[in-house]
């Protein structure tokens, strides 16, 4: 089965880059055997959920203090703690992703470096490493490749 441009428009009505996404998906989906209605639906649904309809390709961590307490209560137990991180995405990433998913501690900067990116919002040094290994590149190259792809996908 092939995903048509019209189907993609119906699934992603607010996305201004349908032509580019359709071209990319038409080339890549068959390579990964995403070729049945069920597989295509699952893939598109997961990616659309993670990326806000194929629009946000880098995790948005620009939270107000009140939201930090609600969304990340494990890390922000009270509003006073959250205020120190409010509207500081890099600092937030380094706190919430510290010492997990292969990342170092908060001071390592790994949380920010390996924050969610791409349609699936790949997150964490371990996941970047697995992704990089599948492409025979280093995690740092995967980070640069992801950043480059995310910033240029609409200009191709």
Predicted feature descriptions by range:
Residues 2-48, 69-89:
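Export/targeting segments at the very N-terminus of extracytoplasmic proteins
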Residues 6-9, 128-146:
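Substrate-binding clefts and substrate-entry loops adjacent to catalytic sites
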Residues 32-39, 108-114, 144-146:
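Structural motif
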Residues 39-54, 86-103, 122:
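Short, functionally critical alpha-helical segments immediately adjacent to catalytic or ligand/cofactor-binding
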Residues 54-61, 133-134:
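Short, solvent-exposed loop/turn and secondary-structure capping segments
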Residues 59-68, 122:
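Short, surface-exposed glycine/acidic/tryptophan-bearing loops
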Residues 110-136:
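A structural motif
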Residues 147-151:
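Conserved small/polar residues in nucleotide/adenosyl-binding loops
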């Amino acid at each position: 089965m092939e995903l048509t441009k019209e189907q993609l428009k119906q699934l992603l009505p607010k996305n201004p880059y349908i032509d580019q996404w359709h071209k990319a998906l038409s080339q890549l989906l068959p390579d990964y055997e995403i070729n049945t209605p069920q597989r295509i639906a699952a893939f598109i649904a997961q990616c659309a959920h993670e990326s806000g309809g194929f629009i946000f390709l880098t995790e948005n961590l620009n939270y107000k203090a009140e939201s930090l307490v609600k969304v990340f209560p494990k890390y922000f137990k009270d509003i006073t703690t959250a205020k120190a991180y409010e509207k500081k995405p890099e600092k937030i990433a380094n706190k919430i992703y510290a010492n997990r998913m292969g990342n170092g501690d908060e001071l390592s900067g790994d949380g920010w470096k390996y924050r969610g990116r791409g349609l699936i919002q790949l997150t964490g040094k371990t996941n970047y490493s697995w992704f990089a290994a599948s492409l025979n590149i280093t995690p740092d190259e995967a980070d640069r490749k992801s950043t480059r792809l995310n910033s240029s996908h609409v200009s191709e």
